[in-house]
Regions:
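Charge-rich, low-complexity amphipathic helices
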Residues: 68-72, 100, 118, 122
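Short alpha-beta junction capping motif
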Residues: 24, 77-118
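Extracytoplasmic/secreted proteins, especially bacterial periplasmic and envelope-associated proteins
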Residues: 41-45, 49, 91, 95, ...
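Short, functional N-terminal and low-complexity linear motifs
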Residues: 12, 16-17, 63-64, 89-91
Length: 122
């Protein structure tokens, strides 16, 4: 009986955790690398694909979050895209480092020519 109750409680708890919705943050950064590239398609398409194929519950409304803001810690997943140059101040780099070390996930989509710039910043 106790075993059944424990299994039932674990099932209820896990179904609650996995049914929660969360929002993905779109990373706003400096350097002229147009962080807003494909604003209307890139992240919305990724969210739609995940919700449809993986049965996730990602909020389709994307939130814009600045790399140096404490708000970055409100998002378990942040998406970064653009073309070309990426520049982080020391404070922004430190904030992003803390976010990643705390378990945050950064998805970098090299939309075109961003690779060599982002590697020096990371």
């Amino acid at each position: 009986m106790i075993r059944t109750v424990i299994i039932l409680l674990l099932f209820i708890k896990s179904s609650f955790i996995f049914s929660q919705s969360y929002q993905i943050g779109l990373l706003k950064y400096s350097g002229g690398g147009d962080w807003y590239a494909n604003l209307e398609t890139s992240l919305p398409n990724l969210i739609k694909f995940c919700n449809t194929n993986f049965k996730t519950s990602i909020n389709p409304e994307q939130a814009i979050v600045e790399v140096g803001s404490v708000d970055i810690f409100n998002y378990p997943f942040i998406h970064m895209t653009g073309h070309g140059n990426v520049v982080f101040t020391n404070q922004e780099a430190d904030n992003l480092r803390k976010y990643l070390l705390a378990g945050g996930f950064l998805h970098v989509s090299d939309n075109y020519g961003m690779d060599k710039f982002i590697r020096t910043e990371l």
